[in-house]
């Protein structure tokens, strides 16, 4: 009896154990499958998060500017980057959330060398357009202001000299200009347009600003081709280095020469984004607002109407 019962039980027991084994294997496989899927989902989510983070990462941009070209670019009493051009780029920065601008004050020489080498991404120094410079840097289509140029002359001649044309008729006896300077080219272009009354254009090496003013006061020359902010800062301002000449010298505006930010050649995407922002700021009147704040007048009104990058001035 016992032997027969045991023989009957053993096959049944083996069947049950086999079923448990199959069930356990199935459960383990299912668990493994779920875990693998969960791991894949987690990896995908992490990948998507990483991609999103990369796409939205803020790019830091180094904006170099000159240290003491007041009021265009300078370092204020608090040690902060300031000036008209810096203010324009701070306004641009607010419009471009994908970028964060860091301002670096430096010399004009280091600015150009560093910008070309990629040390800086943007350079601000009241730059005029030249074909030679455009070979090294990116100019946007939109300028951001101008350098107002004209002549400093003896106040005693104010009835006869009111602009560059009347000065040319008066004598045209101009303080010599370096032939490498953009001012030299401007007077050359003036003479082409006024062949009957040209200005005496004499090439010269660099000289001290005080010499130019003194030569005019002495009568050696009748005018000095100068930038208005330089005249205002050095002669008109009460703390100007040559304020003692303020009652003896006057200034007559010729025209506004557009100024531009420069971009490293590898930063075309940044240049395009900033160019679009400049156009919008100009349209909204923000540039005129900043001009009035830093200069007390419009730096746009004396730019020749219809001027485009590359036009003769």
Task: Tell what function each PLM region has.
Residues 63, 67-70, 78-94, 150-210, ...:
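Bilobed "Venus flytrap"/periplasmic-binding protein-like clamshell domains
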Residues 47-127, 205:
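Extracytoplasmic small-molecule ligand-binding "clamshell" domains
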Residues 17-30:
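Bacterial lipoprotein signal-peptidase II cleavage site
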